[in-house]
Amino acid sequence: MRMLPLKDKAQVGLWSARYIADRINQFAPTAERPFVLGLPTGGTPLTTYEQLIKLYQQGEVSFANVVTFNMDEYVGLSADHPQSYHRFMFDNFFNHIDIPRENINILDGTASDLLAECAAYEAKITTLGGIKLFFGGVGSDGHIAFNEPASSLRSRTRIKTLTQETLIDNARFFNNDINQVPKLALTVGVGTLMDAEEILILATGHNKALAVQAAIEGSVNHLWTVSALQLHPRGLIVCDEAATMELKVKTLRYFQQLEAPELAKY
């Protein structure tokens, strides 16, 4: 597993956007052979989305032959709800690039049969040949997507009850009122993520430092679902200085030495 320790959130956003754009361009997608990209929501990826939009506007990347699958969605929120992940993605990314509407896939938290919705999502990913690159963030408790602590590391797309810590973290999007935060969500599973050809996880801020430590220095542990990346042949964590604060000095220096050519660009 790689870890790229950058200076700040701005560098993390710029580097990750260029990385995603490079992967798309190297793949040279067509309508018959699209690049399948997994996407997150939340505060961490916003800078990446801003930079991807700039790259698109500059003609450096096109999303015309990209198919996306979002990681998760709240149960019970309509697509036009201000805090739905549908709304987040269109407001912050999709409305600003050239991706066709039919190429966008987001779980429907208002589906009449939620289990069928999850099964259909998995089936569509499989039909398209799997996800090439899954881009995501990590929670302060180490969760990826809504795979909360103690999630099965072989889990698939399913309904998930959110932990108190996640509800508190997300209350900032609901007028700081934890009672407004939905208690259930639909989420891709850890197994779904691990099936991707490549996983790119971003971690920024002091509140992500314990999660980064668990992912890099800890053992594979279902209480820190991000630690499953240790088992992936192409797992990459990109973080800022604040998110490395719990790492041992020798661990941080090791990755700084490994990634010296990349770090020298910034």
Curated annotation (Swiss-Prot):
Q: What is its EC number?
A: 3.5.99.6
Q: Which Pfam families match?
A: Glucosamine_iso (PF01182)
What reaction does this catalyse? alpha-D-glucosamine 6-phosphate + H2O = beta-D-fructose 6-phosphate + NH4(+)
Q: One MF term in GO for this entry?
A: glucosamine-6-phosphate deaminase activity
Known partners and oligomeric status = Homohexamer.
Concerning its family, UniProt says: Belongs to the glucosamine/galactosamine-6-phosphate isomerase family. NagB subfamily.
Q: What is this protein called?
A: Glucosamine-6-phosphate deaminase
